[in-house]
A protein has these predicted regions:
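Structured interaction patches on ligand/partner-binding surfaces of diverse proteins
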Residues: 50-73, 139-165
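Structural motif
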Residues: 1-11, 87-99
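Conserved "repeat-terminator" motif of extracellular CCP/Sushi domains
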Residues: 68-83, 165-175
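Beta-strand-rich structural segments
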Residues: 46, 81-91
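Short Pro-Gly-centered beta-turn/loop motif in secreted/extracellular proteins
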Residues: 11, 32-43, 47-50, 119-141
Length: 175
């Protein structure tokens, strides 16, 4: 849920990047970085390649902090369980290969592009909780003279397998 609940363990061995410095979390999920210049903004982020579970994703990409002088500042970096998004693109039941799909988080507007495989299937690991749309890239539709549907769905926290077997249908455009 993006918050450490009582009794929930911290994530150990996660690389945290603080400006030009890095630190690994200890067995409780805590990390420490020293000698950060006071009053200067610094970006803090989790190196997602250091997470031991590929479904864990940082709740936010980066945090910008401005540390005070001679003081300790706590900054929690929450992880959430992402979903697996998988399905196929079809035209009259036949797979549509090598098309670009656009996954859009409707809250943030952030877009992610992905391509279908040769058999028309697609797969994305670690989709953050939220409301999304998925559609074939309009440029691909225009180039192939197709029209397509837009899927609207919600990725819910803690349910990684909820977005399986999605079917995105396209059809020939009217002339």
């Amino acid at each position: 849920n993006g918050r450490q609940d009582p009794g929930e363990p911290g994530a150990a061995g996660v690389r945290v990047i603080v400006g030009a410095f890095t630190s690994l979390t200890d067995s409780t999920g805590r990390y420490h970085v020293w000698d950060i210049p006071a009053f200067e903004r610094v970006l803090v982020q989790i190196d997602s390649t250091s997470l031991d579970n590929p479904l864990y994703v940082p709740a936010f990409t980066t945090a910008s902090v401005q540390p005070p002088p001679n003081a300790y500042r706590r900054l929690d970096l929450p992880l959430v369980t992402g979903a697996v998004l998988e399905g196929r693109v079809v035209q009259e039941g036949a797979p549509v290969s090598n098309v670009t799909l656009v996954l859009t988080n409707t809250s943030s507007g952030k877009q992610t592009s992905l391509a279908t495989f040769g058999d028309g299937t697609f797969y994305v690991l670690g989709v953050k909780p939220g409301r999304y749309t998925l559609e074939v890239d309009p440029r691909d539709l225009a180039a192939r003279r197709l029209v397509g549907q837009t899927l609207v769905f919600t990725a819910e926290p803690g349910r990684p397998d909820q977005l399986s077997n999605l079917v995105l249908e396209v059809r020939a455009a009217a002339r």
